[in-house]
């Protein structure tokens, strides 16, 4: 099951050239860029691991691509995404986020049903990948 989080998630994976164009756009807007990775694909997992430091005041697309390639080499079997942060007063938010690397196999999610007070049903879901300990999921 393909994970759909962030911008472009319903499109085919971006090529390196397309990624460069998105980074160039973010740089032209003076947005700070960071690279994150995780092996926990749950949609509510907001705490991905940060690769290095955020790339504040970077005006060179190749510098970002170098960091991206370094992250890909070390975490090739995990999810990797790029975030762009706009620090403009009144915005101060992540304005662009897209996945640029995925595991070769994405196992999908399990629906979990439990009974609550008054026989009410509660539903939650978890990734099949999280059945294994962190660091050995993919």
Swiss-Prot record:
A GO cellular component entry from the record: chloroplast
Keyword Heme: no
Keyword Plastid: yes
Pfam families: RuBisCO_small
Biological process annotations from GO: reductive pentose-phosphate cycle
MF GO annotations: ribulose-bisphosphate carboxylase activity
UniProt cross-references to InterPro entries, sorted A to Z: RuBisCO_ssu, RuBisCO_ssu_dom, RuBisCO_ssu_sf
Keywords: Calvin cycle, Carbon dioxide fixation, Chloroplast, Photorespiration, Photosynthesis, Plastid
Main location: plastid
Gene3D superfamilies in the cross-refs: Ribulose bisphosphate carboxylase, small subunit
Additional detail: In this alga, in contrast to plants, the small subunit is encoded in the chloroplast.
Subunit structure: Heterohexadecamer of 8 large and 8 small subunits.
Family in the record: Belongs to the RuBisCO small chain family.
The name this protein goes by in its record: Ribulose bisphosphate carboxylase small subunit
